[in-house]
Amino acid sequence: MSDVEEVVEVQEETVVEQTAEVTIEDALKVVLRTALVHDGLARGLRESTKALTRGEALLVVLVSSVTEANIIKLVEGLANDPENKVPLIKVADAKQLGEWAGLGKIDREGNARKVVGASVVVVKNWGAETDELSMIMEHFSQQ
């Protein structure tokens, strides 16, 4: 036993959580995955127009680079119906929208393979309340 006591100073480090900026596209990807799991997506023009005319649509995602201008006019017209106005988001790439909507195969590493493009996707059921969903709804309330 020694007469000298060792004093150990413990410094507490405060960890500041850095919230990564979540873009609208990232939030949309999470919302579409959640709706896909809960069987709440209508994928493609035929299913989407049926959901829009029945009034089941909660959100419409449209590809802005569709070759047929009539498709854009039809979907925008149904989404902007005065009786049942539905929020509309436009994305650039059909293959990316198809991947988000589950129109492809997933390999062992988790990468998407054989992805089919989608011109329009309609969310009929949110599935679960997430932070990304509230972010998208807040985005539409600001517009």
Curated annotation (Swiss-Prot):
Origin: domain of life: Eukaryota
* Gene Ontology biological process terms, A to Z: cytoplasmic translation; maintenance of translational fidelity; maturation of SSU-rRNA; ribosomal small subunit assembly; ribosomal small subunit biogenesis
Q: Write one Pfam family the protein is assigned to.
A: Ribosomal_L7Ae
Q: Find the cross-link Glycyl lysine isopeptide (Lys-Gly) (interchain with G-Cter in ubiquitin).
A: K85, K95, K114
Q: Where are the transmembrane segments?
A: none
List the GO cellular component terms: cytoplasm; cytosol; cytosolic small ribosomal subunit
Instruction: Report the locations given in the UniProt record.
Output: Cytoplasm
Check the record and name the InterPro entries matching this protein: Ribosomal_eL30-like_sf (IPR029064), Ribosomal_eL8/eL30/eS12/Gad45 (IPR004038), Ribosomal_eS12 (IPR000530), Ribosomal_eS12_CS (IPR047860)
> Which cysteines in this chain are paired by disulphide bridges?
none
Against PROSITE patterns, the record matches this protein to: RIBOSOMAL_S12E
UniProt-recorded Gene Ontology molecular function terms = structural constituent of ribosome
Question: Does Cell membrane show up as a keyword for this record?
Answer: no
Keyword entries, A-Z: Cytoplasm, Isopeptide bond, Ribonucleoprotein, Ribosomal protein, Ubl conjugation
Read off the PANTHER family from this record: 40S RIBOSOMAL PROTEIN S12 (PTHR11843)
Instruction: Describe the task this protein carries out.
Output: Component of the ribosome, a large ribonucleoprotein complex responsible for the synthesis of proteins in the cell. The small ribosomal subunit (SSU) binds messenger RNAs (mRNAs) and translates the encoded message by selecting cognate aminoacyl-transfer RNA (tRNA) molecules. The large subunit (LSU) contains the ribosomal catalytic site termed the peptidyl transferase center (PTC), which catalyzes the formation of peptide bonds, thereby polymerizing the amino acids delivered by tRNAs into a polypeptide chain.
Question: What is its quaternary makeup?
Answer: Component of the small ribosomal subunit (SSU). Mature yeast ribosomes consist of a small (40S) and a large (60S) subunit. The 40S small subunit contains 1 molecule of ribosomal RNA (18S rRNA) and 33 different proteins (encoded by 57 genes). The large 60S subunit contains 3 rRNA molecules (25S, 5.8S and 5S rRNA) and 46 different proteins (encoded by 81 genes).
Family affiliation: Belongs to the eukaryotic ribosomal protein eS12 family.
| Name recorded for this polypeptide | Small ribosomal subunit protein eS12
This protein's encoding gene: RPS12
